[in-house]
């Protein structure tokens, strides 16, 4: 249900990727007092103070300036030219040439991600019926051509609020109501389309007006959290002085240019070609394409989709489709609270972090190998999606997938039963927003033995809920042999590190250094090492030179807890890294080093990266977390 994930996205906290705006548990809430304190600090320091890190400054062993080796010395900072403004096209212009793609898209969840209210777009019953939750009445009704909701407002008094936009399509639909300051807020009472009923997304909560989890609260704001992945060409346009929004977008849905990029030059090319001439001066690809999927390859395609189908921090105000991901986003790691220790999804993490753990991702399998690109539905029904590759004669691109898998000898379940479905064992679903099951895209082999040892979930007892994990682990051993239990898994080391067990840091450092591990796993290992200043120094230093930018960014953060004499030579070259996420991580990790301990070239590079860090936080001043980061 990839289409559902994007069309139902609710976690868009730029500065704090763990914030989930609509269905977030109270355990992760931020007290309103912290917001006030953070704002006050920012006003005092004007947002320019640099944080000293999680530990006090570590003195450099020598009074001499610390510089990296000559071969790695950064070049003087070069002003980066502002990119040319994107040339957007009218979304309707695409259908003239791409009629079949447009037809498939019109029926997709992407097309219905956000719509103006109308008889066709509103699924909920606005017929005067009333829904009650925790003593609050919410009534849905129409007046003339307006869809209205009567419920408690920010002051706690009942008021009538007009639906400005629908949000999502199936299995649920929410409604955006407008508050002063250009704020669009998703009502927490949503429409359950399959059951034709209203329901509350937080049934166990009573968030009063003024609470950040009340539907009018700051952490329920769709301008900050949601709309960028429900629209095309979103511009948040937050005014920090007025604490207001003037948000705009090119199209109120996930349209062609959300994935293919601004199409103005491509339309110019198409019109010129139709007129019998070519435009030789078009920039970029020969057809004026902003994103050329044929040239991107499997992993490049995943990065385009991951712009929204991921839990991540936004680094720029206007991310460019098809640009290197870590220039515009910092993906969340497999941290506690988001993922189980073995990498299974826990919180709303939106597919990508799971998929990048998988063997399929490493083999180059792209999203469109399983999902039709424009309808976003599965390309084949049921197990046929999997057996196009996992078969005796697989797709020639993936010869390692050869084998007979859709058989009882493999899955050990009755043919045609629920247990015989590939996804039942390899993509167990977790339900979010109360009614939306989302399959885990790590496509893992079930490991009930890990459930026994570290308490993680497993697909077997998700179905056989009346059976213990050991029963399932014993069955797997009988079927596939004892070797399955002896296969090492990073989850064991991560679970030990999360619990602070002796010796865990050494095991985590070994994972960070293991190039065979997925980059998101190695980045998570490096993140865990931050709490262990004496462990894994070699792994951190080596990771700073890794080919993978996600690993380099995590290494920069992990190096912060090392003595300055050790970390500075590794961090200074990262100030000139090609990718923004790495540069600002290095700047943050060097902020506690006295400037006089750096040579002039290193100071200049640090100044440039620190300015970039301020710019990144300024993108998210609507989120108190960004203001807090600037202040400390």
Predicted regions and their residues:
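Short inter-helical turns and helix N-cap capping residues of alpha-solenoid HEAT/ARM repeat scaffolds
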Residues: 516-518, 547-549, 578-579, 623
